[in-house]
Amino acid sequence: MYRMQLLSCIALTLALVANGAPTSSSTENTKKQVQSLLQDLQLLLKEINNYENLKLFRMLTFKFYMPKKATELKHLQCLAEELKPLEDVLNVAQSKTQNSIDIKDLMDNINRIVLTLKGSETRFTCEYDEKTVTAVELLNKWITFCQSIIST
């Protein structure tokens, strides 16, 4: 009588382990991708901090939104939603000066990594903080997020 329930339980457990449980290799791969994202965000922040022209600095005061809580990879959906406005602001700023990096390539790489890390789940809705942040603050907060993911 209990044999069927036991077999069902074992089958379900095996299915969950095979399909859903993270393995050490997937965790390592995730950490490598987060490390890549961290490096790209730091490069972007460095580039923004190199702007010396006051007009460019004013452009970088454009306001962005941060989620109320950013602790899991699914919260990268919130970063993904802010990438296009950030790229637009940086492209305008870059057109006013001669910068050493290609913003478009860097933003494409960041976007690709974010989409890979957050997965195809699109039902997650970001809850944004009411307080807005500058581009520098946005990048600093996401850099901190990446560092916390790597350290766990």
From Swiss-Prot:
Cell compartment(s), UniProt: Secreted
Reported function: Cytokine produced by activated CD4-positive helper T-cells and to a lesser extend activated CD8-positive T-cells and natural killer (NK) cells that plays pivotal roles in the immune response and tolerance. Binds to a receptor complex composed of either the high-affinity trimeric IL-2R (IL2RA/CD25, IL2RB/CD122 and IL2RG/CD132) or the low-affinity dimeric IL-2R (IL2RB and IL2RG). Interaction with the receptor leads to oligomerization and conformation changes in the IL-2R subunits resulting in downstream signaling starting with phosphorylation of JAK1 and JAK3.
Molecular function terms, GO-annotated: cytokine activity; growth factor activity; interleukin-2 receptor binding
GO CC entries: extracellular space
Organism of origin: Orcinus orca
Lineage top rank: taxon: Eukaryota
Protein name: Interleukin-2
InterPro entries: 4_helix_cytokine-like_core (IPR009079), IL-2 (IPR000779), IL-2_CS (IPR030477)
Family to which this protein belongs: Belongs to the IL-2 family.
UniProt keyword annotations, A-Z: Adaptive immunity, Cytokine, Disulfide bond, Glycoprotein, Growth factor, Immunity, Secreted, Signal
Disulfide linkage: C78-C126
Gene: IL2
Main subcellular localisation: secreted
Keyword check for Cell inner membrane: no
Keyword Secreted: yes
GO BP: adaptive immune response
Range of residues in the leader sequence: 1-20
Positions annotated as glycosylated: T23
